[in-house]
Amino acid sequence: MKTEKSQEGIDNRMLEKFYVSMMNTNCYLYYDEDSKEAMVIDIGDTSEQLLEFIKENELKVKYIYLTHCHFDHISGAEWLKENVGGEIVILEAEKENLKDINVNLSEIVSGKSVSFEPDKVVFEGDELLIGNDTFKVIYTPGHTAGGSCLYNGDILFAGDTLFLGTHGRTDLPTSNYSDIIRAIKTKLLTLPDDTIVYPGHGGSTTIGAERELY
């Protein structure tokens, strides 16, 4: 297990990263030390290390957020909910893709069909509260038709939209190259340069560093 703290743990906010699934997906656990409220982002498979950390720190998982429908970002969601609770959340535009094994690629890639309903759907501009921290939902189609990111002022959970030095694939079901470039340019690169980007795979970066590539 590898862990990271968001900007060394500013105030009472903490961030841990766990690698999950056959695709080595970054699964993030964001939590507030005072309230113990937590949000898990993109749990692509079961993770006993994540579960142990949540229980040892007595965290209360409020949301299990899925940035998009691909199996390596969703396959552990129901398992985590069964063990620690929390609402499974996804953008409304991605709800149907979550249930479609041909779009979420679960059967063709992993050999295991994954299909389920979310507990809650959100729309662009909606906000999720963890402790005193507010996360804004940003609709970023392109990698999938209903992809999204979460932004709270100094960090961005980018899913598979924006990576260190590149962007998400656009050769998969419902993906579109023009859409992802437009979303990055008009919705993400407008954020402050010092915004830390935590992607679905690979290392972190900043908006300022990625702006130079576009």
Where are these regions (language model features)?
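Conserved beta-strand hairpin/beta-sheet module of binuclear metal-dependent hydrolase folds
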Residues: S6-N57, C149-G159
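Hydrophobic residues at beta-strand termini and immediately following loops
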Residues: F18, V122, T140
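A generic "binding-loop/recognition-motif" signal
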Residues: M23, T46, H70, E94, ...
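Active-site neighborhood of phospho(di)ester-bond hydrolases with catalytic His/Asp-centered motifs
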Residues: V40-I41, K62-C69, I88-L91, Y139-G142, ...
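Active-site HxH/HxHxD metal-binding segment of metal-dependent hydrolases
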Residues: D45-L129, L213
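Metallo-beta-lactamase
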Residues: N104-L105, E127, T134-Y214
